Amino acid sequence: MKKKLLVILGAGSSTPLGMPSVPDVDQLMAQWGIEWATWRGTTDHFGKLWQSAEMYYKSGPTGPRPALNFEKVLGDMVALAHWMEPPPWGDTLRQAACGGAPPPELIFQSQEPECEAVEDLLADEGDLVNVEHETIGESLDEVVPASEESPTGKYGAYIELMDELSFLLEKLAQHMRTLCQRFDPATGAAERYRMLLRGLREKFDVGIYNLNYDAAALNALPGSYTGFGEMGTFEPSVIIERSRWDFVYHLHGSVHHSLSQQFGDEICWRRSLDEHFFDGSEGRSNDKRSEGRSFPITTLIAGGFKLDQLLVEPFHLLYATLVRHVYMADAILIGGYGFGDVHVNRALKNRFSRGDGQLPVMILDLAGDRTGPMAFRYDLWAMEVCSAFGADGHFFAEPGRLSPPVPGDLTARGTFEVDAQHRIAIWHGGFVGAERRLPGIIEWLDGAADGVLIPDSGQ
């Protein structure tokens, strides 16, 4: 029986294939935010919140700090939309923090003056309604809270924020699908990507959790189970009962995902990317999750509050199986992942904090020109790696050498940075670049000593 290899793929694994990096998506979101604001004739809230977060981070001391990217700002949009919902449906901290006043530097074109809104609310609490259940229409211009005759009024700011957020998520889904339609499988990078995953599958029973929306892993391993049946319907019972792995699960959504109908909330699987897709649309009703926060009904997960976003299928069950498979795995390979998703990091940390034996963990990453040895790194990526696996950067070394290794030199020599005590190996030459060391990687994941990672060992 083959050993089980759990593979977790982040954005860096598919950027050599023409898929966007996180900074690429940052720029796209900025452009789409301006497009939305121009179309609506209002403020680009994504851009404003980006500037606000950037200013906040810069006001702190130098040193490690949270990453500012599109996902952070999308999460802020969710939080602000909840903050701007009128009582009693919004965030109670707004009353404690600022006496119920809105943010002073943000402008919402369709929000009535705060003093009038508060007077209305105090005058008639019976008019308070949940927008989730009391909205109609497909666009902002048609969304009408039950107690209002137009989108202006108590819910104006909330509607604007959710409208732009839905627009951005829909644009992201469409953009990723277009890139996958244009994907060229004949490139050298695509061939090496396929050889890497197929080589792993020959030796192991491989289960892949793709944190990206692209179809790169599916293209490399056609026939892998996705969690959806022949007719495109989600199959929870099959997922739960499946003993064989050989799957590619898209934990955060896929370009193959579509809402079953334009105003439905069930996600189905479209085999061909040329079919018609429904990715959610701005202005439609939203789904309430924990603490009353609203989230757009869409085909993918992006932004903050991911545990809330994971509460709907297929994401809910796929996350549950990730936790299960972390415990079942005989070895783990992580490719191009920035360790920025707490729900993934925590699943790993819970498994590795038990102290009941270490399994091999191979991390395939692309180091920058100025990246230092793990022993001297204090950036968030290195800190999260050590936290997830209960390791310490000072234990990492190049097999057969004593001095702390420089990642650029390791890549040039075709070797790894290894923590022998915790059985963690880091390849700094990129996901696709690791294909040239595939035999050694396979042997090491299968339990061989660290020596197989030394180039002159014949691997």
Predicted regions and their residues:
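Extended, H/D-rich, highly charged conserved domains that either
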Residues: 46-174, 181-189, 193-298
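SIR2/sirtuin-family catalytic core signature
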Residues: 1-17, 22-54, 241-244, 313, ...
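Intrinsic disorder/low-structure terminal segments
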Residues: 45, 69, 107, 276-277, ...
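A short acidic-Thr-Gly-centered motif at the start of a beta-strand
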Residues: 1, 192-203, 318-327
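A Trp-anchored, charged/polar loop motif used as the substrate-binding/catalytic surface
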Residues: 187-193, 232-234, 307-321
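Gly-rich Lys/Arg/Thr-decorated short loops/hinges at beta-loop-alpha junctions or inter-strand turns
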Residues: 298-304
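Generic alpha-helical structural element
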Residues: 185, 206-209, 311, 333, ...
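Glycine- and acidic
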Residues: 304-308, 329-331
